[in-house]
């Protein structure tokens, strides 16, 4: 046996050193400090002292087992148990038990037998049935017995059953080992029963403890059971080893309540939904809906919020916020550093504006020495044309905008992308509505104006009248002390055209127009269309940089690579500098007129930015529709009847024309008839347009386009009619007629005759009969009537009889006498008037 110090023994037995020294002294082992060692002889003496403190008690128990019938079997069980006496306590605070110390010493020596218990169990079994009964009996005894004493046990204390059987002699017989294991099993069963009863029935435990003390037995308690050392293995009667027996545990959920709320920093982007905002603040979506409701906003968890509303919600709930910069990618891609480049003078961009048929395109045609007007339907410019003209004093880029009312937005775009505006006013017509509008656009864009008084060659031309009318609209000529140059021109004879160009170039010198000729190109989309065999085609005005074939470009929500470029004469070019209009091919789709064009080096970034812009447009459209729902509800409140809707599918040749027609048609909507353009696009009418028209009962309108063969066949089958136009006035007039057809006819009353009562007769069959003279119009038998007394209507009904002398009459004309019987009315008096009227339908007009 290895030597051990007093300190090590005290540490392994979980006892204080002073208490252990006193206990060793009581056993006759003198030690003075914790560094003193214990010899094997002293350890053996210590064990003998512990064993001598134990007593052996014998107990016999006889039980009776019933068999079938009247037979009984007596079962006698003898138990021997060693019970250790309590050692005298040296200190009141220290609990010293021989069993504890014995277990501790066993852990040190590991080969000394501390506890020797032998239970002689004699069982008398006469037959196999008695053995089975005994097994059932022992199983019932092993179960804990809980009486209904008003207490509820949620869990038993965890009891570790450990092995306390050790071998003292290597030659111990196998039968003795088996007996020890069975004895350990019995001790555990009784201990569990005692522990359960101790917890459930406190009073019964005390009474049983007294009885057990009288017979020399000591009752086990939970504290003693918890102090058993080693692993006690449980075996059944046949020696089969069982698993470790443990009392069930009760799982407890540990939760620490937060002391204060967590303040989060929420990143808010435009169009954030309620559910996304709730997730970032770690709250339920219903809480945010509740906050919105308190703010007077009805919302769902999937509804998008603007940034201002989201900020209010975050601050209301006690969190911080940061705004997400959604334009970071756009700023990084579209902003071009041109600090290393030098500016050069560029050609002026001139827009020709004015009223319809005042000669804008004719003037430009004379300047370009071409016949552009011949190619326009009806002599009216349908979309913007961009042309570059070279003169002796420099180049000028012209933009020709439509003049009639439908193309307001196109004129506004032309004014934004131009340097100088040539305002064409016909000398024989004066200032017209589109002339005033052109002046407003030019002033809003802060663009200088040069007035061209056209058609000066006509005899009825009056330029002084034009000057006077423009002066009233704050366009003051230089001759009157203003800053606007007036030039009399004739697009037919060419008179004054050279002076006009000189005035434009002079104005451009004053403006000192400059641009960067190098670097990535920037510009604006003047016009766009979809051409068969070429795909999307965009007319672009380059404003800065150098646009080259093969560049990656981004136009609004469309992107692509420049596959080909053509100038205003239709010739292919490889590069285009500032103030140069070009047609480009290669875009992914048709961009909107007015979109900015920018060259991006990385095609992947261009695609990503285009997708981001498209998503923004969709979100903005959804938000706008959501905001209009409530206003539409209030606008429709109190209106009688259902609003008729004229659905239209519009296809055009160019983007600008489609946009202008769309705006003009939407303006035709009234409270009774609404124009709904369910689809619009560029290019020929296809079979998908026909299918959509059938599904939505819409009218298909083509402006300068036609239907393809597949669409025509499908239209014949489904009965869809196409309407083709090349003049916008005709299109608008036909749509007005179609809207008038949807209007419900108006019912109007028309008085057709008046009869004056001269005398009243009594009839047994008809009651009161009025003898009348028809003084106006004609009285008809089948028409409704009104009875007037002193020009006040006192009755309205129908005629029951109308007679001329004794014969029935269907009508009586003016100047003839007749007898009139009013149905369900007998209070007819002399001097009354009987008014006959009819209800007619009158078609409504817009």
UniProtKB/Swiss-Prot annotation:
It comes from Francisella tularensis subsp. holarctica (strain FTNF002-00 / FTA). NCBIfam families: IF-2, small_GTP. SUPFAM superfamilies: Initiation factor IF2/eIF5b, domain 3, P-loop containing nucleoside triphosphate hydrolases, Putative DNA-binding domain, Translation proteins. Residues 354-361 are annotated as: G1. Residues 345-512 form the tr-type G domain. GO terms for cellular component: cytosol. Its main location: cytoplasm. The lineage of its organism: Bacteria, Pseudomonadati, Pseudomonadota, Gammaproteobacteria, Thiotrichales. Residues 400-403 are annotated as: G3. This is Translation initiation factor IF-2. Residues 454-457 are annotated as: G4.
């Amino acid at each position: 046996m290895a030597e051990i110090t007093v300190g090590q023994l005290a540490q392994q037995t979980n006892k204080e050193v002073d208490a252990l020294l006193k206990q060793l002294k009581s056993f006759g082992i003198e030690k003075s400090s914790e560094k003193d060692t214990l010899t094997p002889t002293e350890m053996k003496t210590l064990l003998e002292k512990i064993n001598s403190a134990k007593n052996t008690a014998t107990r016999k128990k006889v039980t009776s087992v019933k068999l079938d019938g009247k037979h009984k079997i007596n079962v006698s069980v003898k138990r021997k148990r060693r019970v250790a006496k309590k050692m005298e306590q040296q200190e009141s605070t220290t609990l010293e038990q021989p069993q504890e110390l014995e277990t501790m010493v066993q852990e040190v020596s590991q080969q000394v037998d501390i506890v020797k218990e032998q239970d002689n169990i004699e069982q008398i079994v006469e037959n196999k049935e008695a053995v089975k009964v005994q097994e059932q009996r022992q199983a019932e005894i092993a179960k804990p017995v809980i009486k209904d004493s008003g207490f509820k046990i949620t869990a038993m204390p965890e009891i570790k059953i450990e092995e306390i059987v050790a071998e003292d002699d290597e030659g111990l017989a196998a039968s003795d080992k088996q007996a020890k294991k069975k004895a350990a099993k019995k001790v555990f069963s009784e201990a569990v029963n005692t522990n359960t009863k101790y917890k459930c029935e406190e009073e019964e435990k005390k009474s049983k403890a007294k009885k057990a003390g009288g017979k020399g037995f000591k009752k086990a308690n939970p504290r003693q059971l918890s102090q058993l050392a080693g692993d006690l293995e449980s075996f059944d009667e046949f020696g089969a080893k069982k698993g470790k027996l443990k009392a069930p545990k009760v799982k407890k959920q540990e939760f620490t309540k937060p002391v204060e709320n967590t303040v989060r920093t929420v990143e808010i982007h435009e169009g954030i939904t309620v559910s996304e905002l709730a997730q970032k603040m770690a709250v339920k979506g219903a809480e945010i809906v509740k906050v919105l409701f308190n703010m007077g906003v009805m919302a769902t968890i999937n509804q998008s919020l603007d940034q201002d509303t989201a900020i209010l919600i975050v601050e209301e709930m006690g969190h911080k916020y940061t705004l997400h910069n959604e334009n970071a990618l756009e700023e990084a891609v579209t902003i071009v550093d041109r600090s290393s480049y030098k500016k050069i003078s560029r050609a002026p961009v001139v827009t020709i504006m004015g009223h319809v048929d005042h000669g804008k395109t004719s003037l430009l045609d004379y300047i370009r020495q071409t016949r552009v007007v011949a190619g326009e339907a009806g002599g009216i410019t349908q979309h913007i044309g961009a042309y570059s003209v070279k003169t002796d004093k420099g180049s000028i880029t012209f933009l020709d905008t439509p003049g009639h009312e439908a193309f307001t937005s196109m004129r506004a775009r032309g004014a934004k992308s131009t340097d100088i505006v040539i305002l064409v006013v016909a000398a024989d017509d004066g200032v017209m509505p589109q002339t005033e509008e052109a002046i407003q656009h030019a002033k809003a864009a802060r663009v200088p104006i040069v007035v061209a008084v056209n058609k000066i060659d006509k005899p009825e031309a009056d330029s002084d009248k034009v000057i006077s009318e423009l002066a009233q609209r704050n366009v003051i000529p230089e001759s009157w002390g203003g800053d606007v140059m007036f030039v009399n021109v004739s697009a037919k004879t060419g008179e004054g055209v050279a002076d006009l160009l000189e005035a434009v170039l002079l104005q451009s010198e004053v403006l000192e127009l400059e641009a960067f000729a190098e670097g990535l190109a920037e510009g604006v989309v003047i016009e766009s269309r979809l051409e068969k065999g070429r795909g999307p085609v965009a007319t672009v005005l380059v404003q800065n940089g150098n646009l080259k074939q093969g560049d990656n470009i981004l136009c609004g929500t469309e992107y692509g690579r420049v596959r080909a470029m053509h100038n205003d004469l239709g010739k292919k070019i490889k590069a285009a500098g500032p103030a140069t209009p070009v047609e480009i091919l290669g875009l992914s789709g048709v961009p909107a007129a007015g979109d900015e064009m920018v060259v991006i080096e990385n095609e992947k970034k261009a695609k990503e930015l285009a997708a981001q812009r498209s998503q923004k447009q969709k979100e903005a459209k959804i938000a706008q529709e959501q905001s209009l729902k409530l206003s539409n509800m209030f606008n429709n409140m109190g209106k009688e009847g259902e609003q008729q809707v004229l659905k239209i599918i519009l296809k055009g040749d160019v983007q600008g024309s489609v946009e202008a027609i769309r705006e003009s048609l939407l303006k035709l909507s009234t409270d009774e008839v609404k124009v709904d353009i369910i689809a619009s696009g560029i290019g020929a009418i296809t079979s998908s347009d026909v299918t959509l028209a059938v599904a939505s009962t819409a009218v298909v309108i083509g402006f300068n386009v036609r239907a393809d063969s597949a669409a025509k066949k499908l239209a014949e089958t489904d009965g869809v009619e196409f309407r083709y136009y090349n003049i916008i006035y005709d299109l608008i007039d036909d749509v007005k007629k179609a809207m008038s057809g949807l209007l419900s006819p108006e019912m109007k009353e028309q008085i057709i005759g008046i009869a004056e009562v001269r005398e009243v007769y009594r009839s047994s069959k008809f009651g009161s009969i009025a003898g009348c003279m028809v003084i106006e119009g004609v009285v008809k038998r089948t028409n409704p009537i009104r009875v007037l007394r002193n020009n006040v209507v006192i009755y309205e009904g129908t005629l029951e009889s109308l007679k001329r002398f004794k014969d029935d009459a269907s009508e009586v004309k003016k100047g003839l006498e007749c007898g009139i019987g009013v149905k369900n009315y007998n209070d007819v008096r002399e001097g009354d008037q009987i008014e006959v009227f009819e209800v007619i339908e009158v078609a409504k007009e817009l």
